[in-house]
């Protein structure tokens, strides 16, 4: 996984890698519990690598109660049964791990020369939740014969898209280099950095989590065998 490998190579690699590991072990399920416990559900979270402070971001257009709030990681609520549609997007320029709840967007874009690299990272994280099924019209993202990440014709799907369904409608559509400009999207800047936009909010990212072709080929082959 290119993003994790790059994090391990950075000066603060151990703490960044540990934070990402904690998120995938239990942190995402605890963030899911935090995000679901208010009238203004969170659309994103950031976890400060050095302090462990978690910032919760409701939708920027949520009106009253839409301001961000903070809590220590140790004070997060007990985990839910799943991480819902939370994905680790990358590491911000201020050394915070950015987590986005894809359930907060009907359509969210990934733009850049290789948008499928970031889409693969999201898909692999989403598949950790057994309730999620991914459908895509992109051969660069589908996993062989896996019923949980299959390639299929998607009506109305102009361009490459990924549909994320956890049984709780509406589904989230991830579009890659779409001609339709939306308010929620990740811009890949070509050097491993990027910018995440959710409505009026933006997070500069010094590292975007991606999965390159070689790693994806090995992962998809393993998952394809498991599905068979």
Task: Enumerate the predicted regions with their spans.
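Accessory regions of macromolecular translocation/handling assemblies
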Residues: 1-228
């Amino acid at each position: 996984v290119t993003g994790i490998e790059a994090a391990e190579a950075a000066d603060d690699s151990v703490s960044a890698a540990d934070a990402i590991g904690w998120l995938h072990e239990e942190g995402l399920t605890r963030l899911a519990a935090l995000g679901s416990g208010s009238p203004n559900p969170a659309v994103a979270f950031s976890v400060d690598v050095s302090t462990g402070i978690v910032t919760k971001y409701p939708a920027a257009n949520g009106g009253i109660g839409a301001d961000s709030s903070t809590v220590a990681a140790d004070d997060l609520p007990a985990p839910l049964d799943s991480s819902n549609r939370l994905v680790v997007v990358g590491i911000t320029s201020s050394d915070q791990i950015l987590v986005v709840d894809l359930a907060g967007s009907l359509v969210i874009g990934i733009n850049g020369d290789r948008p499928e690299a970031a889409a693969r990272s999201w898909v692999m994280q989403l598949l950790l939740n057994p309730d999620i099924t991914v459908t895509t019209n992109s051969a660069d993202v589908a996993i062989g014969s896996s019923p949980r990440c299959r390639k299929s014709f998607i009506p109305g799907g102009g361009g490459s898209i990924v549909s994320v369904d956890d049984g709780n409608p509406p589904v989230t559509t991830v579009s890659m280099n779409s001609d339709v400009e939306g308010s929620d999207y990740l811009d890949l800047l070509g050097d491993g950095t990027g910018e995440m936009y959710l409505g009026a909010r933006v997070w500069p990212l010094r590292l975007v989590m991606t999965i390159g072709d070689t790693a994806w080929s090995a992962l998809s082959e393993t998952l394809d065998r498991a599905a068979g």
